[in-house]
Amino acid sequence: MTTFCLVHGAWHDDACWAPLVAVLETRAHTCITPVLPLEDADAGFEDYARVVIDCLSGCEAPVLVGHSMSSAVIPLVAVERSVSLLVYLCPAMAGFQAPAGEPPYQRAGYVRPPVDADGRMWWPREQAVAQLYARLERDVAERIAARLRPQPRAVFNKPYPLTTPPRVPSAFLYARDDELFDDRWSRWIAQALLEVKPIELPGGHFPMLENPALLADVLERVSSPGGRIVI
């Protein structure tokens, strides 16, 4: 079966993948869930990628799934070692040089989290529950929000080593009602930058929490032979 390496986005840790891992493991897949060193204010995306690479020691050809911010992490892993597929999940596509004509990326109404004196972005718990996890059951939303970590803003300001994504098999999954990214931008960037047809998921920015069984279905499909959809 398939080995999925699930790389969380900003503020989170591996706990955000737990519902999806449970589904995938019942289907006999293997899941690896590295935890990025967000506590290191000096770390860049290359440092984040090194953590992922170290977790993949001995794994031949994993499927890398990068959520949100980690759409900038998984390409760097693919440059360093073999992978069978990159899955950009509700991706920010940070770091890459977008082609001309890029539409606004941010969803109207999205309110950015505060930034502290050390340049770290952090979510007050109630704001996170209301803005990020409104589709989840309240107890689940509060449990996830309680685990959020400050995200150093500096990582987004460091030079990114790639201008375009690596030419490896890739899939782009976006959420129709993503709370962070405008769906029109998501469809545009998938085709303009990755040259793949985007796959639409129902719901918001966290499909692994909102509908893990559906996400597992899609991941199985895109990682199967012929599953990538090329323009």
Question: Predicted segment positions?
Answer:
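Active-site loop/oxyanion-hole signature of alpha/beta-hydrolase fold enzymes
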Residues: 30-63, 101-105
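Conserved HGGG/HGGXW glycine-rich cap/lid loop of the alpha/beta-hydrolase fold
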Residues: 2-41
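Post-His helix in hydrolase/transferase enzymes
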Residues: 48, 209-223
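Flexible "cap/lid" loop of the alpha/beta hydrolase fold
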Residues: 79-125, 152-159, 181-182, 187
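Short beta-strand/loop motif that positions the catalytic acidic residue
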Residues: 166, 172-174
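Conserved loop-alpha-helix segment in the C-terminal half of the alpha/beta-hydrolase fold
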Residues: 176-202, 209, 221-222
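Gly/Ala-rich beta-loop-alpha elbow adjacent to hydrolase catalytic centers
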Residues: 65-74
